[in-house]
Amino acid sequence: MGQFSILGFIALGGAIGACSRYLVSEFCVLLFGRGFPYGTLTVNVVGSFIMGLLIAAFENEILATEPWRQVIGLGFLGALTTFSTFSMDNVLLMQQGAFFKMGLNILLNVVLSISAAWIGFQLLMRS
């Protein structure tokens, strides 16, 4: 597969990931309101879980081609998950004086995202 084909597939994965992030974020606002950045937390945890699955899938040769790793890892997950939004959410919480929510957001994103990546990895490594 040529470089331009791979770039096209990465871009497609990125478009799907970005649209997914928007939809998940909007759904979280409908469910929980805007008082806490649930959308960012959700996409980061889900994306970390999928990344764990993806890495294990390559280790177990379930997905053995490099283009899939790039399309899913760089494209889809790169657009789905977001450290910049996570950072901005915390700046806004800090400006509002919501230090407890800011600390909770940081703790939940770090602990749940790392846990989700580990769980996803372990699920396929035991296969």
From Swiss-Prot:
Keyword Metal-binding: yes
GO biological process: cellular detoxification of fluoride
Binding sites annotated in the UniProt record for Na(+): G78, T81
Keyword Metal-binding attached: yes
Annotated catalysed reactions: fluoride(in) = fluoride(out)
Pfam families for the chain: CRCB
Record keywords: Cell inner membrane, Cell membrane, Ion channel, Ion transport, Membrane, Metal-binding, Sodium, Transmembrane, Transmembrane helix, Transport
Record's bilayer topology term: Multi-pass membrane protein
Activity control note: Na(+) is not transported, but it plays an essential structural role and its presence is essential for fluoride channel function.
Cell compartment(s), UniProt: Cell inner membrane
Highest taxon, organism lineage: Bacteria
TM helices/strands, residue ranges: 4-24, 38-58, 71-91, 104-124
Any one GO molecular function term: metal ion binding
GO cellular component: plasma membrane
InterPro entries hit by this protein: FluC (IPR003691)
Family label: Belongs to the fluoride channel Fluc/FEX (TC 1.A.43) family.
Purpose of the protein: Fluoride-specific ion channel. Important for reducing fluoride concentration in the cell, thus reducing its toxicity.
Protein name: Fluoride-specific ion channel FluC
The encoding gene: fluC
